[in-house]
């Protein structure tokens, strides 16, 4: 189905009948990702639509470079790059591990981690991780057992596969689908604000005709097609 063939689909007049799935691909220790999460939650609080939100940890060579440049770090320093990569990977595994004790605790873990890093300006360390576990009330023994398990690593790899299927190349990236057309979605790489998300959701089918398809990197807004 071509994008032009979707123009006859009209949004339901009842906003409550529309359900949106928002996939925000994040670096758990990235400040820019933290701000985008706040914008997504702001949108959810004020929208009349039903929204399912998914925070998905994702990183690759390019996203690590992006993180280092955003933080004015020397991305040519191999030792520093490896250190940053390890921290992002460990934080991602820790978030996936916390989710095994419930979605609510998983979200609380992510929020507390980002509060400690970006508001209290602490470094990501094993000591900070243990402190966060205690603050939000995770089962500590279970946490460390789960984190070392094959299951958590498999769940993490699934997230990387989802990112690849949705053509995500950087973070933060937000992919939006709705229940009226689950084959096509819109991906945002820039200007991820509550206002922009609201605009996309209100005009999703119109935007599917207007936005270009994902054909190359660094497109700020484009359409992706999911193959099921």
Predicted feature locations:
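C-terminal cap of thioredoxin/glutaredoxin-like
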Residues: 17-26, 40-41, 120, 124-228
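Structural alpha/beta surface segment adjacent to cysteine/selenocysteine redox centers
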Residues: 35-120
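Short, thiol/selenol-centered motifs that function as redox-active sites or metal-ligating centers
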Residues: 27-37
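Short hydrophobic/aromatic-rich motifs at helix boundaries and adjacent loops
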Residues: 11-14, 66-68, 82, 100-104, ...
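Flexible, glycine-rich phosphate/dinucleotide-binding loops
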Residues: 31, 62, 183
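A short beta-strand-turn-helix
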Residues: 2-20
């Amino acid at each position: 189905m071509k994008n032009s063939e979707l123009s006859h689909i009209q949004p339901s007049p009842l906003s409550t009948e529309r359900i949106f799935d928002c996939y925000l691909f994040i670096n758990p220790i990235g400040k820019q990702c933290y701000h985008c999460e706040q914008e997504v939650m702001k949108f959810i609080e004020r929208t009349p639509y039903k929204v399912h939100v998914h925070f998905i940890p994702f990183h690759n060579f390019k996203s690590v470079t992006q993180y280092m440049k955003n933080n004015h770090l020397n991305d040519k320093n191999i030792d520093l790059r490896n250190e940053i990569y390890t921290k992002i990977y460990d934080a991602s595994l820790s978030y996936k591990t916390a989710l095994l004790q419930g979605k609510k605790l998983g979200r609380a873990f992510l929020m507390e981690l980002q509060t400690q890093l970006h508001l209290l300006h602490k470094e990501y360390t094993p000591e900070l991780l243990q402190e966060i576990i205690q603050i939000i009330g995770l089962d500590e023994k279970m946490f460390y057992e789960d984190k070392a398990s094959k299951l958590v690593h498999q769940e993490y790899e699934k997230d990387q596969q989802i990112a690849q299927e949705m053509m995500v190349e950087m973070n933060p990236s937000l992919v939006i689908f709705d229940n009226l057309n689950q084959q096509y979605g819109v991906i945002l790489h820039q200007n991820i604000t509550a206002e922009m998300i609201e605009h996309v959701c209100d005009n999703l089918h119109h935007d599917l005709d207007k936005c270009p398809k994902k054909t190359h990197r660094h497109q700020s807004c484009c359409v992706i097609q999911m193959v099921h």
